[in-house]
């Protein structure tokens, strides 16, 4: 039997890829452990700045992460709610036992999808085209396309102090064959590191020495299709390290796997270990530690901010210095994990490899960190593998269309030498890439690709129509200077009116919000629809400016660079630019502008060359 596609690895990337492919194709999902499908080994949360928006983008394109997160969340909060809409995002505490179970049940019910527990030893490749896989027991399985989503399980090692153990997270076996094979085929393999903090017993914490952190009372969800989850929100708690903590860490610094020279891999810049924080930010007297629930079914709390690779006895010593954790009982020790990954500049924007046809890479093995970054790559790899099977062109999101587009373009164009984390600051057009409008940006694509069902799409069309109706009414609704309106504005602590105005003009006042729309229009509509109308009116000028800038970028993206161009032939192009352009092989002039080592002079020279030799190329 020949499968249309094989997905290797059932983490967050593999799950999204397999579910997308199975909508149209016969798909095999291979995992080292069916008990660890979509597991949360690093932290029990989904979302955060930029990442929460990605979860909504995944949902708008037909992915599953948002729906499962809504069902499994035990606390949810809108971050940056007091700031502008460009930086708002949801973050949820997730029940680490319930979430994988929800995903596993979805996989089991999915038609065209076969689940197989096993380890892949190597790929079957002929004439630079993948043909299938071989398992470690010698079984050969043929497929037309293959997606590798092995996360942190390639040649992985667990490190605690000076001890090393060959293993993936949660005791799942590591694998070496794929990494070795791709290295032999000329792929650049990079060594990366991440880590996780200790877990402690709930009832061993003195919560009176901590500050409680509650979720939002208002109902918040990731998915645009509401899921039922009526349970109460679980609290988190905040404590801090102190100078005594830092003295303990400094005293034992050379015993850390990181500072003792036992780690080869590069760690994440934006999620450093506690020993890294103490060394890098030595002027700070304390660091935050969030105490978070891992599951309603576990007597265990996660200590966010205390990731470390210190020996076990030092971990105990560290906890004894932290308020509320002096008597905490460790249920699972912190550790670092290093693993093989692949520099993503070896991929096309479709996430297909440049060297091997029909082979796609997605997730943490592409040098990213985070469940959300992995899931969106799996989704896009699944979509593009499906399109390849249908002989259709790839689907590539632009930087002004989605954070997913920003992430993939950054990876392909700039590569990765350390774990890449998506940040709002990485997006030039973050006012366009908001939490609230992910469906307005992407759901049409999802429907066109056959990933959104008719009922969902009809509901979306009705939502769009309602938004447009309220926008039009707001622009035409006249606010007269009368006692009722003046009294209302006074109640809202807003300036009086000197002459009549429109509701849209009135709403541009910073102290007024969607409640003003509801007060005057009296239209029946969800709060989210009113909020969308408010944002589009209040930030109209800024949004128009961002759209104008995006159009400028689009013009550069339309200038294609022939694949057969020889950069060595271009006179006056710097040596570094020649090397970088030849390595990345940008498809457009816009992409070339974002390559590190290619400056504006190089771009001007390249543009002149392309215009002069266009007919010959």
Curated annotation (Swiss-Prot):
Query: Tell me, what's a Pfam family for it?
Result: GIDA_C_1st
Question: Does the record carry Metal-binding as a key word?
Answer: no
Residues binding FAD, per UniProt? 9-14, 120, 175, 364
The coenzyme or cofactor needed here is: FAD
Write out the entry's keywords from A to Z.
Cytoplasm, FAD, Flavoprotein, NAD, tRNA processing
Keyword Nuclease present in the record's keywords: the answer is no
Where in or outside the cell it occurs: the entry states: Cytoplasm
InterPro entries per UniProt: FAD/NAD-bd_sf, GIDA_C_N, MnmG, MnmG-rel, MnmG-rel_CS, MnmG_C, MnmG_C_subdom, MnmG_C_subdom_sf
The terms under GO molecular function for this entry are: flavin adenine dinucleotide binding
- Domain of life, per UniProt, equals Bacteria
Q: Which residues bind NAD(+)?
A: 267-281
TM segments? none
- One cellular component (GO) term of this entry: cytosol
The biological process GO terms on file are:
tRNA methylation; tRNA wobble uridine modification
The record, for HAMAP family, names: MnmG_GidA (MF_00129)
This chain's function reads: NAD-binding protein involved in the addition of a carboxymethylaminomethyl (cmnm) group at the wobble position (U34) of certain tRNAs, forming tRNA-cmnm(5)s(2)U34.
Classification via PANTHER family? GLUCOSE INHIBITED DIVISION PROTEIN A (PTHR11806), PROTEIN MTO1 HOMOLOG, MITOCHONDRIAL (PTHR11806:SF0)
Oligomeric state and partners? Homodimer. Heterotetramer of two MnmE and two MnmG subunits.
Q: Which family does it belong to?
A: Belongs to the MnmG family.
The name this protein goes by in its record? tRNA uridine 5-carboxymethylaminomethyl modification enzyme MnmG
């Amino acid at each position: 039997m020949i499968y249309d596609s094989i997905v290797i690895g059932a983490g967050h990337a593999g799950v999204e890829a397999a579910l997308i492919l199975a909508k149209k194709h016969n798909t095999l999902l291979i995992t080292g452990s069916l008990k660890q499908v979509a597991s949360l080994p690093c932290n029990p949360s989904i979302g955060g700045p930029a990442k929460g928006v990605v979860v909504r983008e995944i949902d708008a394109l037909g992915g599953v992460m948002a729906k499962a997160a809504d069902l499994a969340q035990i606390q949810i909060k809108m971050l940056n709610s007091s700031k502008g809409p460009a930086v708002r995002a949801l973050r949820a505490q997730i029940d680490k036992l319930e979430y994988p179970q929800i995903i596993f049940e979805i996989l089991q019910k999915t038609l065209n999808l076969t689940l197989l527990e096993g380890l892949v030893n190597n790929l079957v490749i002929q004439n630079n085209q993948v043909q299938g896989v071989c398992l470690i027991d010698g079984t050969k399985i043929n497929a037309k396309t293959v997606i590798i989503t092995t996360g942190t399980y390639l040649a992985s090692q667990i490190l605690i102090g000076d001890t090393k153990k060959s293993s993936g997270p949660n005791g799942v076996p590591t694998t070496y064959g794929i990494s070795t094979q791709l290295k032999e085929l000329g792929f650049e393999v990079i060594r990366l590191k991440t880590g996780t903090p200790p877990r402690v017993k709930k009832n061993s914490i003195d919560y009176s020495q901590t500050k409680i952190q509650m979720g939002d009372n208002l109902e918040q969800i990731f998915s645009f299709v509401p899921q039922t989850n009526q349970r109460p929100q679980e609290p988190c708690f905040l404590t801090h390290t102190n100078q005594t903590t830092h003295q303990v860490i400094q005293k034992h610094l050379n015993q850390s796997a990181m500072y003792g020279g036992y780690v080869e891999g590069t760690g994440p810049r934006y999620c450093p270990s506690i020993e890294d924080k103490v060394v890098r930010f030595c002027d700070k007297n304390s660091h935050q530690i969030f105490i978070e629930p891992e599951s309603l079914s576990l007597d265990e709390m996660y200590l966010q901010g205390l990731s470390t690779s210190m020996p076990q006895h030092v971990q105990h010593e560290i906890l004894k210095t932290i308020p509320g954790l002096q008597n905490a009982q460790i249920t699972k020790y912190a550790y670092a994990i290093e693993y093989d990954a692949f520099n993503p500049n070896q991929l096309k924007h479709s996430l297909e490899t440049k060297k091997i046809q029909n082979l796609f890479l997605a997730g943490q093995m592409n040098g990213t960190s985070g469940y959300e970054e992995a899931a969106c790559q799996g989704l896009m790899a699944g979509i593009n593998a499906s399109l390849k099977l249908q002989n259709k062109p790839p689907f590539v999101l632009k930087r002004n269309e989605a954070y997913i587009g920003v992430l993939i373009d950054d990876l392909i164009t700039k590569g990765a030498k350390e774990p890449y984390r998506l940040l709002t600051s990485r997006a030039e057009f973050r006012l366009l890439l908001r939490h609230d409008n992910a469906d307005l940006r992407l759901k049409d694509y999802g429907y066109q690709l056959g990933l959104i069902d008719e009922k969902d799409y009809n509901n979306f069309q009705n939502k769009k129509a309602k938004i447009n109706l309220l926008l039009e009414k707001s622009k035409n609704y006249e606010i007269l200077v009368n006692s009722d309106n003046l009294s209302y504005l006074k109640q809202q602590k807003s300036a009086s009116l000197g002459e009549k105005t429109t509701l849209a003009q009135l709403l541009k006042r910073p102290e007024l919000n969607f409640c003003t729309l509801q007060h005057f229009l009296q239209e029946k509509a969800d709060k989210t629809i009113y909020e969308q109308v408010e944002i589009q009116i209040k930030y109209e000028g800024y949004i128009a400016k961002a759209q104008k800038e995006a159009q400028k970028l689009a013009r550069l993206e339309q200038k294609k660079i022939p694949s057969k161009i020889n950069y060595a032939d271009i006179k006056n192009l710097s040596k570094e630019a020649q090397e970088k352009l030849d390595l990345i092989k940008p498809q457009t002039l816009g992409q070339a502008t974002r390559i590190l080592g290619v400056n504006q002079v190089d771009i001007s020279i390249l543009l002149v060359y392309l215009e002069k030799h266009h007919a010959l190329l």
